[in-house]
A protein has these predicted regions:
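Hydrophobic/aromatic beta-strand elements that line small-molecule binding cavities or substrate pockets
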Residues: 1-3, 34, 59-65, 83-90
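Hydrophobic pocket/interface hotspot
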Residues: 12-16, 22, 46, 63, ...
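Short beta-strand segments that buttress and anchor functional surface loops
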Residues: 44-51, 71-78
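Short, cysteine-centered beta-strand-loop-beta hairpins and adjacent loop/turn segments enriched
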Residues: 51-57, 107-110
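A short, structured loop/turn motif at beta-sheet edges
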Residues: 9-10, 37-40, 64-69, 87-98
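A generic beta-sheet turn/junction motif
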Residues: 5, 52-54, 67, 79, ...
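Hydrophobic ligand-binding cavity/cleft-lining segments
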Residues: 1-36, 41, 135-138, 143
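Beta-strand/loop substructures that line and gate deep hydrophobic ligand-binding cavities in soluble
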Residues: 75-128, 133
Length: 143
């Protein structure tokens, strides 16, 4: 998934790498609690409650890569396993940012079939989230 954000890479990074702020731009995320004290770093753990297709699920995650302001990756350690990587690239003139998001979630039951069926649904949800964060950052609504 990809979106172009009409804002510099530093502003876009601040919004995407702020774990608690994800509840603002990720429609399916009901809550996010960072359980590791201190600033976000590799090894930081958090727990989200997400609603997918009307079902609330705990989603414990761990930050596994952090390269400000260009790369951020998490591992899902709960019922659904997998990982997500968000990469940022400054636009040619520095006033825009290209954001790419790759996410793999494997359900606990019939994992291959569930991932195959669920992937298009989740891709649509996550693409909408990217457009939402792009609008928020571009409008200055996320600090």
């Amino acid at each position: 998934m990809m979106v172009v954000v009409d804002a510099p890479i530093e502003d876009t990074w601040r919004a995407l790498a702020d774990l608690p702020l994800q509840t603002v731009w990720m429609h399916e995320m009901a809550s996010m609690t960072v359980t590791t004290p201190g600033p976000v770093r590799v090894g930081t753990r958090a727990e989200a409650v997400v609603r997918i297709l009307g079902i609330s699920v705990r989603d414990p995650v761990e930050v596994v890569e952090l390269e400000p302001p260009v790369r951020y990756a998490i591992r899902h350690n709960g019922l659904f396993r997998g990982g997500g990587v968000i990469t940022l690239e400054a636009g040619v003139d520095g006033t825009a940012t290209i954001v790419r998001w790759e996410e793999t979630l494997v359900p606990p039951i019939l994992p291959e079939l569930g991932a195959l069926i669920g992937a298009p649904i989740l891709r649509s949800i996550f693409q909408a989230d990217l457009h939402h964060v792009a609008r928020l950052v571009a409008s200055g609504g996320v600090e």
